[in-house]
Amino acid sequence: MSVNATNLGLSIEQAGKVLNAAFKQATGQEVISQLATGDYVSIATMAQRVGYEQMTNALSQVLTRTYIRVRAYSAKFRSLIKTEEQYGNMVRKITYIDRDIPEGDMTRDIEDGKEYSPYKVRKPQAIQTAYYGFNHIDDYITIFKNQWDTALSSGSELQRFISGIMQEWYNKLEQYHEQYSRATLINLIGGTQAYNADTAVKGAGITRPEMVRHLLTEYNTEHGTTLTRDALLADRTAFTQFAEDLAYKMDTIVRQMGERTTMYHVSPLKSVTENGTTAVTVPIKRHTPRENLQCYMLAPFWDRVKRVVRPGLFANEYLEYIKFDEVAFWQNIETPEKINANVSYFKPVAATVASSKTTYAVNNDSGNAAVELPYVLGVMFDDEAAAICYKNMWSAATPMNPAHGFQTNYIHEDVQWRNDNTENCCVLLLD
């Protein structure tokens, strides 16, 4: 397969700089700070003298450090990707719980003959949440001796050689990165729905209906209609009204998430009666400023809005501040609107059935469920509700195989992802 070097924006001058950096990596010497065309042959000759093994290993490290790390952030769902420092601050999260203001007036409720100590203890209440997953990526590519010989013969050949290596690694890593990010988002969407559908959660009366909006049902209720999804999409007048209603509702969600409340997220459970009739949560209050709100929407739906309604409907003073990304498909490109997955979610309460009797208990652990959603329109969430981080990337090359004249370059990378259902999230369904 031929590779066009310009696909990755790599010029001959840049290729020379990469070779220069690799030479320095292998030998500790920097030949020249700015590599001109006339200087190319001399450094190529010196590189050959260093040896294929050292140069390939050094080149592998330089490409990984200089190019692949930068390119890794161009995959879809890029706003989910966090740096190691950002991700580290999320993994072990301490949340402080508001306590009620003491009743009475300490400065006026004073009686003669009584002592009043200023050393009263009022401990702060806090909880720690940690939700995370881990995986590892390995990839490798083989380079032959005659490729090196050809690559070091001219600047244009080196350009094609390095671009070929980068194209191979870049395509694979980008695809892996996108799939991990997609899975992270799918789990957030499906997990939010699974929480509200959980029988124990419903039995204890701690569902969060505002976290999952059934927009078609809402539309039919508000307008006194009984439209199906297909009928709504086919009716220009009804669809226009639906889109305008949706813009208003999204504005409302943005404003509500910006307030510090217990809405749009799950709170841990403090206690629950055996029959589930009385559940006491530990009320976590969250707020999501607009700059911290992420929004992913199904692209085919927005294409229809632009064509049928009007292009600027969702470019108003509120929505223009959302990190608004269109998604071509959630899980399968052939059925872009559907999600069908096994998901994990935060489950505060557990229910046990024995002899036709259901008893409830505090759980505050993870739950698992199979979720099938026929039409996911979008999701709006705090940027701490879902995150993914790539770290510990490194590469190395094997010695040259003397019998067959090749060596293999390996690249390794760790992937960590997380969902936090105690952060604000709202799933928009067209059902």
Task: Tell where the protein language model's regions lie, with residue ranges.
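Intrinsically disordered, low-complexity boundary segments flanking structured domains
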Residues: F77, I127-A130, V280-I284, S395-A397
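Extended, solvent-exposed, turn-rich assembly/linker loops in the middle of proteins
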Residues: A194-N342
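Long, contiguous amphipathic alpha-helices that act as assembly "spine/axial" helices in icosahedral shell
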Residues: Q128-A200, F406-E413
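A structural detector for beta-sheet-dominated domains
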Residues: I97, F144-N146, N363
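Assembly/oligomerization interface modules of large self-assembling protein complexes
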Residues: Q54-I141
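Extended, compositionally biased alpha-helical segments that mediate assembly or anchoring
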Residues: M1-V70, A299-D431
